[in-house]
């Protein structure tokens, strides 16, 4: 097994709420669709009830942001990062515990305490000038990175080093989709599709009584090297679950004329790129799918099956770089059975 490393993906969860917009489902059944913008991304929520739950959706977004949004200076995670508090709420605690499970099963290749390194490279919630990254700065930050340096005492989060900071962006967007799904289920909804910035929580069927079908981006490079997205159609299971995608083939910065990927390896402190360019995960929850998609970006394709075996009910699709064709796809047998023909 390759040496395992702590890594986290940077993602933007800027505080910025937009109101829900309701659209009816016409003659296709008693379904409601809510759309809008939140956290500088879009959301789309469909469910089998002719009731407007937009206020409950907005309340869920606000509660999530107050707990886990590192861009919100009033959030709990911001206060903990500034050492102004040690107190968590149930949401922050749940996400942290799930992140620790993934960290342990990956041998530390997934780690939410990598925030200072992510910030150093300009991908995190503290904007930095990436041309100022030096070996000395990287070494100093690496000294206080590590999920095993965080301890819980009830609802208190205790850091071994006060310089430690956490960023749950690599898992919390999926968790937010789960929170909306939970809210709908508490109100009697049995079929829903909650999509937040590409992270999806799902259950049941659509308004035609069929399994939900979604599109997953598959990059294709033309002869000139231009990347075009092709949609792989995936028929989701009827049982509750989540789908999430992480990838590097579009998210990068240019530093001194070089493309820098947004996955940082704190073992070295520098960006990492394996042969995995994108990972799509289907899992029992969207939070788990989100975190595992991130973790897959730190591994070679050959290492991913062993990682996924630790998590029952998880399937994957990987986009790999290929010198001849530009990209190629690798899927688990379970994922492949869900892909619809072109």
Predicted regions and their residues:
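Mature catalytic core of soluble alpha/beta enzymes
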Residues: 2-6, 17-342
